[in-house]
């Protein structure tokens, strides 16, 4: 299946249903009063993480998704049916971004996690809502509000504990093949790896970690050279970066310069990513004697001014690979993954349409109080008075709806 890690889609929440203007008409009840019901709320749009998906290919061609509109209110105080929600399944590790405002709406990092990305419109009010002691036959209603509509950018970022960095042909794919059951393509030409891949490294019966291999970086990647830096986002959730260095490049380049280039490209992409723990691992020591390899690595670290620990391995033969994996596992255990979101106490959500109905009711009440004495005529005695009115209605508007 083709690996797709970005997709732009259009999502539209359902509009709210309109309120209804209606009056009760039954035998022997000629003036039954208002009985127009409210409309239904529009359907919402959700994203839900699914661990059985590993690509956004389902959204490559199907680009528009719309929730159902709420039904209009009806007579006999019947409320319109709420619009049906739609739930879009996405792979675990998907980030949702508003493409117009560039606002990050959230990350889905756990199976079954659900996120609201478009809120449906609020329902309109029927004329029953406007009944009062001075407005016995209201003919007012409100319309449903429109649902949210937005262009949503979906970005898939792999969830891995360890990320691999390095120039093309540094041996990243060979390393993953050596330590896991993953079988990425390996060949003697640059950019053999075209898409990211994951491998699970089992250190012992009870400990394992996930390593991510991305296509190699070259100088100018931040400006689009090679495959660019689009795949670096897959390393943002890694806890440690393994910078694999070829100590004997076939093109004769200086390994120290190659390390500096990767550091520069990493910083240009994200300062936060460049500050992650990064280990230098010198590969292909099987191409020379141990003494020569140690001498060359010493020269490289002196040129870089590298004062931290480093490793010498041969991914092809497996030399010194197990100790490296054990050290990685110890680091992961000692540095648990940071929570993606802080656990905060839930707050009462105030939706943008909450005051809309209050303002409409207050406006109509004010108009009725002003115009009641001036516009009243004897003919109004034949209007639809509310026969079931009681003293409880004398308190003003009967506001039943609570959002």
Curated annotation (Swiss-Prot):
Its main location: cytoplasm. It holds the Pfam family GTP1_OBG. It is found in: Cytoplasm. Its EC number is 3.6.5.-. SUPFAM superfamilies: Obg GTP-binding protein N-terminal domain (SSF82051), P-loop containing nucleoside triphosphate hydrolases (SSF52540). GTP binds at residues 166-173, 191-195, 213-216, 283-286, 314-316. Its cofactor is Mg(2+). Residues 365-397 have a biased composition (Acidic residues). Gene3D superfamilies: GTP1/OBG domain, P-loop containing nucleotide triphosphate hydrolases. PROSITE patterns: G_OBG, GTP1_OBG, OBG. Residues 363-403 are annotated as: Disordered. GO terms for molecular function: GTP binding; GTPase activity; magnesium ion binding. One of its GO terms (biological process) is ribosome biogenesis. Residues 1-159 form the Obg domain. GO terms for cellular component: cytoplasm. Mg(2+) binds at residues 173, 193. InterPro entries: G_OBG, GTP-bd, GTP-bd_Obg/CgtA, GTP1-OBG_CS, GTP1_OBG_dom, GTP1_OBG_dom_sf, OBG_GTPase, P-loop_NTPase. Keywords: Cytoplasm, GTP-binding, Hydrolase, Magnesium, Metal-binding, Nucleotide-binding. Residues 160-333 form the OBG-type G domain. An essential GTPase which binds GTP, GDP and possibly (p)ppGpp with moderate affinity, with high nucleotide exchange rates and a fairly low GTP hydrolysis rate. Plays a role in control of the cell cycle, stress response, ribosome biogenesis and in those bacteria that undergo differentiation, in morphogenesis control. Belongs to the TRAFAC class OBG-HflX-like GTPase superfamily. OBG GTPase family. PANTHER family: DEVELOPMENTALLY REGULATED GTP-BINDING PROTEIN-RELATED, MITOCHONDRIAL RIBOSOME-ASSOCIATED GTPASE 2. Monomer. This is GTPase Obg. The gene is obg.
């Amino acid at each position: 299946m083709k690996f797709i890690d970005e997709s732009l889609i259009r999502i539209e929440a359902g509009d709210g249903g309109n309120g209804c203007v209606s009056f009760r008409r039954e035998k022997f009840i000629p003036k039954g009063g208002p009985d127009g019901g409210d409309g239904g709320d529009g359907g919402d749009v959700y994203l839900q993480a699914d661990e059985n998906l590993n690509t956004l290919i389902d959204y490559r061609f199907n680009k528009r998704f719309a929730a159902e509109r709420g039904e209009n209110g009806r007579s006999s105080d019947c409320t319109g049916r709420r619009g049906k929600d739609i739930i879009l399944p996405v792979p675990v590790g998907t980030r949702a971004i508003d493409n117009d405002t560039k606002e990050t709406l959230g990350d889905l990092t756990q199976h079954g996690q659900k996120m609201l990305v478009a809120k449906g419109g609020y329902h309109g009010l029927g004329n029953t809502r406007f009944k009062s002691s001075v407005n016995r036959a209201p003919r007012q209603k409100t319309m449903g509000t429109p649902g949210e509509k937005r262009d949503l950018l979906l970005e898939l970022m792999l969830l891995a504990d360890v990320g691999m960095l390095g120039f093309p042909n540094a041996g990243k794919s060979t390393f993953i093949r050596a330590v896991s059951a993953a079988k990425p393509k390996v060949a003697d030409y640059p950019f053999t790896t075209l898409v990211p891949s994951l491998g699970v490294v089992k250190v012992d019966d009870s400990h394992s970690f996930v390593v991510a291999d991305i296509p190699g970086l070259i100088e100018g990647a931040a400006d689009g050279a090679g495959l660019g830096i689009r795949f670096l986002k897959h390393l943002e959730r890694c806890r440690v970066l393994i910078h694999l260095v070829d100590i004997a490049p076939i093109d004769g380049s200086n390994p120290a310069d190659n390390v500096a280039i990767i550091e520069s490209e990493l910083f240009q992409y994200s300062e936060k990513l460049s500050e992650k723990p990064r280990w230098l691992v010198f590969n292909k020591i099987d191409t020379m004697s141990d003494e020569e390899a140690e001498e060359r690595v010493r020269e490289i670290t002196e040129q870089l001014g590298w004062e931290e620990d480093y490793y010498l391995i041969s991914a092809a033969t497996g030399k010194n690979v197990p100790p490296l994996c054990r050290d990685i596992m110890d680091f992961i255990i000692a540095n648990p993954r940071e929570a993606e979101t802080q656990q905060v106490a839930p707050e009462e959500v105030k939706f943008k349409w909450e005051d809309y109905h209050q303002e409409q009711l207050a406006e109509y009440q004010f108009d009725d109080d002003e115009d009641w004495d001036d516009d009243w005529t004897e003919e109004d005695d034949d209007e639809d008075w509310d026969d079931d009115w009681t003293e409880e209605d004398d308190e003003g508007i009967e506001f039943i709806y609570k959002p």
